[in-house]
Amino acid sequence: MMKQCDTAHGGELFVTDLDGTLLGADSRVSPRSAAMLSELTRRGALITAATARTPATVEPLLADTEIHVPAVVMTGAGLWDHAARRFASLRLMDSADAKRVTELTLRLGLHPIVYRAEPDGSHLTFRFDPTGMPSEQYRFITDRANLELKRPVVTADPVGEAAEGPTVLILAMGSDDAVMAAVKALRGNPALSVSYYTDPVYPGVAFLEVFGPRVNKAEGLRELKRLTGAERLTVFGDSFNDLSMMNVADRAVAVENALPEVKAAADTVIGPNTDDSVALFIARELGHTDLL
């Protein structure tokens, strides 16, 4: 159940993507940006992030940033309350759909990972069967094995884990051909949000992500706008997955290093992510020139 946010009031809500937008070249929030955003929040500004990341990596990134508005995480599947350290809301998969998706991935020779939420909303578990998993795919697992808010669970029955739920995400890994076959089979089902990607960190591995219905950053922002009572929405982005939230914003802002298509869709283009550009823009827009 979604609760009204403690910071709820009218005004403008500022939402920034993380990677390539708020985060600098070292993939961190700079001390200057963290200090500025924290002080703006203390002065009443509504500021938060929207990202494909899970809370397990969002939480340490925002550790020095005192923001009170929940962050849109997992591409819109959840709102993460940074102050309370738990989910404010989640968009779950139907258990029967989660079961069918997991069965399909196994038939296609993929290795599914079932992301489930704990009942108290404090963290996620990701459940997987390592049997026969190639080394590059298993490295994806081990890279995430020591995160406080995303805990691994080995299982011999991923289908049963998905059916039992509550399931937030089915992530499956395998060859490009097998993943594309799964995408073709699943895309077009209104009960599912399906995407495909590769990651140069894991060469030769393709990834399938399947969430419940209408999971994207735009839907997450609509929910967040209702939650905060904000009258206007300004978003910041750099990549293709930011376009959906830019389309529902009152004002779309791209950083200088954004993809050309993102800059073309933006109302305003600011400096690069390496120059604290998001924090500086918000401070100027709200008239807090003493922070510049």
Report each predicted region and the residues it spans.
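N-terminal glycine-/serine-/threonine-rich phosphate-binding loop
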Residues: 2-17, 21-47
